Amino acid sequence: MVTISLQNNSSFMDKNKIKEVLTMGRYFKNKFKEKVYKTPISISGFTCPNIDGTVAKGGCTFCENDSFSPNLQERKPSFKLNPRVEKNPFLDKQLKQLEMQFFATKQRLENKFGAKKFIVYFQSFTNTYAPLDTLKALYTKALSFDDVIGLSIGTRTDCMTDEILDFLEDLSKDKEIWVEYGIQSFYDKTLDRINRGDDSANIKKWITKTKQRGLKVCGHLIYGLPDETQEMMLDTFNQAIDLKVDSLKFHPLYVVKNTLLTKEYKRGQFIPITEQLYVDTVVKSIKNLPDGISVQRVTAGIEDSTLLAPLWCKNKHSQIKKIREALLKEGLKY
């Protein structure tokens, strides 16, 4: 639940009128009475159905997965898992990779922050796009690690099944289980334009089914998609809220090298969102969040040479600062 902040350095606003945005950190602190740290995991062999040709080829026009998942850059996959095989020949390697990544990150967080509780975040590519036995082995292994309170699983709605939901529902009886769906937009013409390979009806169907199992859902929204107006972005936000998602992540669309979007940008067919419009749209969204819905991310960026545009996405800390300041003017503390 959103609580009243007792600490605010603003001299021009009544402290008692400042509301705290329910960040994920605050959500976990309220529930577990101490901070919970996400440990991002990138398992080699996973891919996406719009990369391998199942629903499309080439992937989303904006996606160069390494750029969105830094953990993957040092762990280039040497094999690709066929999601339709009965037996996964790479499972032992994947389980070992999971263990090595988790404990390396856990130790770093313990040393730096004194971390005591963790949630394992299956981040890169589509983390339900694999044989069910593989998913069961990976998720069960992750939950067996000391001090792990749950899982967060990044995936697509077209890669969810009733059988996977059965398993996750069973896990959720004892653990905190989150499913993170890449919604991006509820406009089918936009989803077609970015080669998403999924449609709004299917997205809504599986979010609804996931919620019916009592599982937590985090929706990822991208602001600044091709030809989308602020009205369209806010409509996507409102539709996500209507689906009763538990949390949201906001991302600006930026152009990185080696993507289909790069070609559109260089031909003048795509104009990136301005920082001012992005900040304004995120602030308008957060202002209209119902109580109890958390915000896991307000922006994203990339600081290396692969970023082509917009250049304001190079400095994520600057973006967050501007969003914080804009929210504070609206009586909200992020």
Could you say what each language-model-derived stretch is?
Residues 2-40, 71-72, 247, 254-334:
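Auxiliary Fe-S-binding modules of radical SAM enzymes
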Residues 68-105, 109-132, 147-160, 176-202, ...:
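Core AdoMet radical
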Residues 132-140, 161-170, 194, 233:
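Distinct, well-ordered alpha-helical segments
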